[in-house]
């Protein structure tokens, strides 16, 4: 599967409808973004079962702001509607493969449990347990 252009109009639906979504926040004027693009495209072909989205931060400033994107490129991975990875910087192919493998290996029941515990603690005004 090739990459999908994500906009504020299709972002939520894409994340809701797919179990595993990678998101590349980028801009056309960004040199590292242009260097990362072929690496990302190749990974999208290798992992055709996953959705590889791209957010043009110039055209989708509202979306970039909603995620607090401060530098580009930034790669984010969302599994089961939970952001499980977010990191600025262009990754080499090997590092991208490693990150995808780690995200695939996550026990999402544990992730959802940790999120629920953190939200409950936050609702009580407590700090989440850093040890998880």
PLM regions and their residue ranges:
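Conserved helix-turn-beta segment immediately C-terminal to the redox Cys motif
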Residues: 18-22, 35-55
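Short pre-active-site segment immediately N-terminal to redox-active cysteine/selenocysteine motifs
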Residues: 19, 26-29, 71
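Structural micro-motif
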Residues: 61, 67-76, 91
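Non-catalytic, surface beta->alpha helical segment in thiol-disulfide oxidoreductase systems
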Residues: 76-110
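A short beta-strand-turn-helix
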Residues: 3-21, 61
């Amino acid at each position: 599967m090739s990459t999908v252009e994500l906009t504020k109009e299709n972002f939520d639906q894409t994340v809701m409808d797919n179990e595993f979504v990678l998101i590349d926040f980028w801009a056309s004027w960004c040199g590292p973004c242009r260097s990362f693009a072929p690496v990302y495209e190749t990974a999208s072909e290798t992992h055709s079962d996953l959705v590889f989205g791209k957010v043009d931060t110039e055209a989708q400033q509202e979306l970039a702001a909603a995620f607090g994107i401060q530098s580009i490129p930034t790669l984010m991975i969302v599994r089961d509607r939970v952001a499980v990875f977010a990191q600025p910087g262009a990754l080499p192919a090997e590092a991208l493969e490693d990150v995808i493998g780690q995200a695939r290996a996550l026990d999402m029941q544990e992730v959802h449990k940790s999120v629920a515990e953190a939200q409950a603690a936050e609702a009580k005004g407590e700090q989440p347990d850093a040890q998880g």
